[in-house]
Amino acid sequence: VTTPETSRLTAETIELDDDPEALFVLSLEQGWGDGAPILPPTDERIARILAATPHPPDHIVGVLPPRNGVCTVELAAVNAAMAGVEPAAFPLVLAALEAISAPEWNAFALTTTTSSVFPMLIANGPSRDALGINYRAGCLGGAAGRGSMTIGRAVSLCLRNVGGQKAGETSRTVFGQPARFGLCFGEWEERSPWPSLSQRRGFRADQDVVTVHGGKGTFPLADVNNDSAEDLAYTIAKSIAFPLNNWYLEPTGATGQLVLCIN
């Protein structure tokens, strides 16, 4: 089936039998898989994803390091299709890739470092539930929301297949971390007494926004003793003051950011 969207596609096409394992095996052999099963990026599925954005397939979203691959909307859609992204979530994938490509985000350092750091996506806005972006129990892993699992994975696949980030080759990460498969979660705006992260950054509450943060993993803090907000705040403050990861280095410790999730 040829559509206006697919008629302008330029990516190489391959033909495989209908066995779903065939594509999985090929992705591992060719090096453009992440070790987990992928969905076939057929013309029909790509067309549905492309229809969710006003940009043409050849629109350049950004240049992704470490090999400075030019990421077009088409290439982003192919990787999103393999990750299982539903069309309505594709604009968030594009927004995340655009943010990562911004020079001030320093994605080259992130994709080549020996550290475990990787893009962590924080979603705000009214579409969190509809897209399956987790922000309640298990939001950092295990809640099984489609948006959380596939949006983060699509960004990871784009960095791998367009940017050329591969562990042991262009990426020198020593241990990596589970979030390198993809990490995307939302803010529980309805329960928070404060303006949302996106509102504090100048966006409206009715806008769907994704913030990209270079995260190095999670550090759980459980408090079962304190009853007052003041005591809890004291425990949190004393805990995050501990120089984890690169925070003991200068100037990283003076300029780095920490994401604190409270529930």
Residue ranges and their predicted role:
Residues 1-263:
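Non-transmembrane, aqueous-exposed alpha-helical and coiled segments at domain scale
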